[in-house]
Amino acid sequence: MRRNRSVVALSGGADSATLLYLAATECIDLHALSIDYGQRHIKELECAKILCDGIKVPHTIIKFDLTVFGGSPLTDKSLNVPAQSENKQSSTVVPYRNTILATLCAAYCKQYNLNTIYMGPTHEDLANYEDCRRVFYDSLQQTLRLGGTVHDLVIKVPFIDTEKKDIVHLGYTKLSVPYEKTWTCYEGGDKPCLVCDACRERITSFVLNGLQDPLVPDYDTWKRLEESIIYKD
């Protein structure tokens, strides 16, 4: 059986960064692959590169334009990114993004003689994203084995049953993940918007660990956010 030679599907977000650092402890040969699919939050790719440079992991960015399909505020700037309070998270789905990403990772595995793909769906993702279910990845793994030439290909999804707060706990206490070098916000600004679903989930994960998000350095702002999470009911 081949040793674990892997590629991480890397977005540059907090969960993804933790996945990268976890994979680095398990692999003898590790690469990272990101997609520039026309996302408005392109800053995440800058963070992905910084993360990989920091631990000397080869990083490739593939341009694969998904804006032609429209329908998601992540790729269509004429649409507003919904605040979490609007309960419209399903509108942020980018159709078949994870299928495309996994397929590109499989092709990368063939090129570089790798046999494992790490992807980062989490427990919270299951509510809104059909392509974050375990059955999806089990089926996709079999499809990629049958349709390609890496017949022992494995898709690892170590966080699929893990809550985001526990991912941050792992990254902070065990892996020393530099969360200040990550980007989660769906907006494309210089600072996180603090109201979109991605921001609120990130903030909650830090609050529940008794930590201050390094992307929100202002103490008063953080305390207000913390109280909004703790006393939201």
Residue ranges and their predicted role:
Residues 1-175:
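ATP-dependent adenylation/nucleotidyltransferase module used to activate substrates
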Residues 103, 183-204:
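Local cysteine-cluster metal-coordination motifs and their immediate loop/turn environment
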Residues 117, 186-191, 211-219:
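Charge-dense, low-complexity polyampholytic segments
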Residues 125, 206-207:
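Glycine-rich nucleotide phosphate-binding loop and flanking beta-alpha elements
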Residues 145, 209-210:
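Short alpha-helical linear motifs
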Residues 159-186, 224-231:
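Short, charged low-complexity linear segments at domain edges
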Residues 200-202, 206, 212-233:
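Short Fe-S-cluster ligation motifs
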